[in-house]
Amino acid sequence: MIPLLESVARPDGYLHCGPSGAGHYVKMVHNGIEYAMLQALGEGFEMLRSAPYDLDMTAIARDWNNGCVIRSWMLELLGDALEGDPRLDTLTGDVGGGETGRWMVETAMELGVPTPSIALSLLMRFRSRQDDTFAGRVVAAVRREFGGHAVKEAE
């Protein structure tokens, strides 16, 4: 099976992590990191939207993704989402998801590993079901862009 996976993977895009379960564990941690990174993007762009300036958030996302220390594929995807809907008015801030984040936080607690950023980002996903915030819209929009995750359309 490994030769088949290696033959279809992009260069350096395949990793055998160890015995049964190790790959799922690594993916769980990956998703936890993703939760925190998305939450940080959402909070930062909500700050930009709340500023007393008329800021072009699409241009900011594009600029930050061009050599800035926080450049990332997620920031590129946010720029794409903002390009078509600069205020993200077509969707709600209900982020959805939460299953792998919960697994990550529960596992961290069992191991005694502090993961406050990831835990708080999980709680903010639950909060997004109650409150429609721009930060939640940012997270939902980027999740739609990279994973085709469903978003709730604004009424």
Where are these regions (language model features)?
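Phosphate/pyrophosphate-binding betaalpha-module
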Residues: M1-E6, Y14-C17
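ATP-dependent carboxylate/acyl-activation modules
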Residues: E6-S7, R144, G148-E155
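A conserved ligand/cofactor-binding region detector
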Residues: R10
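Helical "substrate-binding/catalytic lid" subdomain
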Residues: G21-H149
